[in-house]
Every structure is written in structure tokens, then in C-alpha cells.
């Protein structure tokens, strides 16, 4: 019997050994450094958020609750990026695959298209999304692929090692201040002509298109929360390797049928 492709079976063995024997470096010694593996493994969560539609569902609920004006929508999309960023190390997948389509659909709903009508809302929303992603990408170590590589270089050069929670604590104040200012400054600069948004209708249409929440979305919520918890635990002197946590999370998305190996390769 071969219930899963060979690469997934191999990774399952790697994950089991890493967790049970705490020998992540030894297990991955032939596969470059652990930082690269963490990035690759956590990328599966980025793919899962896009494939399941969970990212879009979260977005439409935020739009329904808070997006009654263009300025509020700026904050909604910024904080959507913030919510997704701890579990999506690909800021391209996060911004272009989840946040951008939401901004685009809202802009089109108010008749804002590239060209003469861009100033209605589209120019502001898309610019705001771009700059918000730049901030969320450094707020968490797992929010952008190069972050853990940078940590690896810092550790090798200085001997200073930061875990996931320490990185987040160091970046929180400057990051949060910037995230609060970006939508407002962008709004003052772009001055969108459309001020009020029919957010209830936009959200209702979007959620209707997505349909009821699927089992894969519920499973992804559990996996993402457990992964983030695993990355935080070393702060409390609980020895668990961040790379091992990421690999287990990736394996869980495969085993639960949330994504396939081909989805990850794409």
C-alpha cells in the first residue's frame, strides 16, 4: 500500500524523528540548514489558506463587520494581512493571492477601475494593501521567507539567538504604529472620492460564493493555531524546534487532505 506520495512519507519520518528524538539538525543534515526547511514547510500553510478559501472568508467577515467606509476598509485589509501573516511566510501569496483579490472586488463593486475611475477607491485600496504587507512581513519571523534566514545569519555572526515570540515582541511596537498610520496617510494622500461602502452586500455576495465553511477550512484553523502555539512555546522554556513544528504542520495539511503535494509544487 502507498497511501501518500513518497515525498510525504519521507517527511512524515523526518517530522516524527524531529519531535520524538529532538534531533532536527541531525535528521536534516543532508538537506541544508533548518531555516530553509522551516520556510519551505511553513509555505504549505500559505498554499492552504489560498486553496481552501479560508483567507477570503476571514476577509469578507472583517469587511462585513468593519468596512463601512473606504478608510475603514484600509484598516480592514491591513489587519487582514496582519491576521494571516504569522502562518503565511510567503508575503506574495498573502498579498497577491488573498488581500489583492478582495481589494479588487471591492474597487470594482464601487465602479473603480484603472484609469479615470481609479481615484474612486481602487488606487487607495491597492496602494494601502501594498504598504501594509511591507509592515506585516517583518512583524513575525514566519511572515516572510527571508526572516528566518536573517535570524540564522545573525546567530552565526553574533551568537545571539531569537525565538519566534522574541522576534514578535521586538517588532510589535514599531510595526503596530506603522500599521495604524499607513491607512490614514494613504487616505490623506490618495483622497478617494467614494467615502461610503455597501460593505454588507459585498460581504454577503463574497460569502455566498464561498458557501458554507468546509471541513478543510476548520482543519486549517486548528493546524495554524497549533503551529503558532508551537512557535511560541520556546519562550516558556519548553524545548521544541520551530522547524519541527513547521514540518509537522505541513504534514498535517497533507494527511488531512487540505492540500496535495502537487498544490505545494505549484
Question: Predicted regions: what is each one?
Answer:
Residues 76-77, 128, 170, 248:
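Hydrophobic core positions of alpha-helical segments in small-molecule transporters
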Residues 51-54, 91-95, 110-212:
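Juxtamembrane and boundary regions of transmembrane helices in multi-pass small-molecule transporters
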Residues 71-78, 122, 126, 216-225:
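Short hydrophobic alpha-helical membrane-embedded segments
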Residues 1-38, 156-158, 166-266:
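Hydrophobic transmembrane alpha-helices of multi-pass small-molecule transporters
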Residues 4-114, 262-266:
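Membrane-embedded alpha-helical segments and adjacent helix-loop junctions characteristic
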Residues 42-49, 83, 87-90, 135-138, ...:
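Hydrophobic alpha-helical transmembrane segments of multi-pass membrane proteins
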Amino acid at each position: 500500500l502507498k497511501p501518500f506520495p513518497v515525498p510525504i512519507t519521507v517527511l512524515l519520518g523526518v517530522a516524527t524523528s524531529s519531535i520524538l528524538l529532538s534531533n532536527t539538525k541531525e535528521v536534516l543534515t543532508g538537506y541544508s540548514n533548518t531555516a530553509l526547511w522551516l520556510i519551505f514547510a511553513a509555505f504549505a500553510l500559505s498554499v492552504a489558506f489560498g486553496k481552501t478559501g479560508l483567507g477570503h472568508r476571514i476577509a469578507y467577515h472583517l469587511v462585513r463587520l468593519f468596512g463601512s467606509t473606504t478608510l475603514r476598509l484600509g484598516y480592514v485589509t491591513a489587519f487582514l494581512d496582519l491576521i494571516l501573516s504569522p502562518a503565511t511566510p510567503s508575503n506574495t501569496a498573502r498579498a497577491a493571492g488573498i488581500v489583492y483579490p478582495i481589494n479588487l472586488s471591492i474597487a470594482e463593486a464601487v465602479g473603480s477601475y484603472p484609469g479615470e475611475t481609479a481615484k474612486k477607491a481602487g488606487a487607495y485600496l491597492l496602494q494601502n494593501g501594498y504598504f501594509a504587507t511591507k509592515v506585516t512581513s517583518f512583524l513575525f519571523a514566519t511572515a516572510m521567507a527571508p526572516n528566518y534566514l536573517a535570524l540564522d545569519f545573525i546567530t552565526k555572526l553574533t551568537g545571539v539567538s531569537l525565538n519566534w515570540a522574541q522576534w514578535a515582541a521586538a517588532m510589535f511596537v514599531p510595526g503596530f504604529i506603522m500599521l495604524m498610520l499607513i491607512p490614514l496617510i494613504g487616505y490623506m494622500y490618495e483622497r478617494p472620492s467614494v467615502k461610503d461602502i455597501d460593505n454588507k452586500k459585498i460581504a454577503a455576495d463574497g460569502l455566498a460564493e464561498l458557501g458554507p465553511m468546509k471541513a478543510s477550512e476548520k482543519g486549517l484553523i486548528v493546524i495554524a493555531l497549533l503551529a503558532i502555539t508551537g512557535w511560541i512555546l520556546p519562550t516558556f522554556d519548553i524545548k521544541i524546534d520551530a522547524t519541527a513544528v513547521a514540518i509537522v504542520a505541513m504534514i498535517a495539511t497533507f494527511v488531512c487532505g487540505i492540500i496535495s503535494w502537487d498544490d505545494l509544487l505549484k
